[in-house]
C-alpha cells in the first residue's frame, strides 16, 4: 500500500502484479464471513490501481468484484506447455511422473496438464461422514471448501 500511495501521484498508470492473490480462497460467503479478496481488490482500485495481474486465482470470478477495472488471471498450465516447448533440455521421466487432482474442481486442469506432459493422471475422492466417532471422540476437520 505504501508503494502505491507514494507512486500514484506521479504515475500515469499503476499496475499491480500479484503472484498470489491475497485471500483468494475467501471468495464465497458462508455465515457471517467477510469476502476479504473482493474487499482487497476494491481497496486497490480505490487507491488508484488501474490493472491487477495474478496467476492461478482460486476462482477467477473474483474479478466480478471490480467489473470496471482490469483483472488478468494467467493460468500456469499454459505456461508449463510454453516452457516445455521452448526449453528442449527439460526432460520428463514419464514412467515415474503422475499428475494428481486433489478434488473434482481441479480435474480439468489436471487432465490438461497430464495430456501436455504425456503422463498418467489420478484423482483423490473425498467423502465426508459428519456423524462418525473416532476413538470415542468427535473430530473437527477444517477443510478449505
Describe each region flagged by the PLM:
Residues 1-145:
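PRPP-associated nucleotide enzymes
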Amino acid at each position: 500500500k505504501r508503494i502505491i500511495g507514494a507512486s500514484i501521484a506521479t504515475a500515469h498508470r499503476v499496475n499491480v502484479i500479484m503472484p498470489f492473490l491475497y485471500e483468494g480462497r475467501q471468495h464465497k460467503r458462508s455465515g457471517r464471513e467477510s469476502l476479504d479478496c473482493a474487499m482487497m481488490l476494491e481497496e486497490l482500485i480505490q487507491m488508484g490501481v488501474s490493472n491487477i495481474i495474478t496467476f492461478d486465482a482460486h476462482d477467477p470470478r473474483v474479478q466480478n468484484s471490480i467489473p470496471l477495472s482490469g483483472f488478468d488471471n494467467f493460468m500456469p498450465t499454459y505456461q508449463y506447455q510454453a516452457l516445455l516447448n521452448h526449453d528442449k533440455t527439460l526432460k520428463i521421466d514419464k514412467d515415474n511422473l503422475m499428475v494428481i487432482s486433489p478434488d473434482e474442481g481441479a480435474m480439468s486442469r489436471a487432465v490438461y496438464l497430464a495430456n501436455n506432459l504425456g503422463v498418467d493422471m489420478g484423482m483423490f475422492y473425498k467423502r465426508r461422514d459428519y456423524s462418525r466417532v473416532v476413538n470415542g471422540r468427535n473430530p473437527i476437520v477444517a477443510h478449505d471448501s
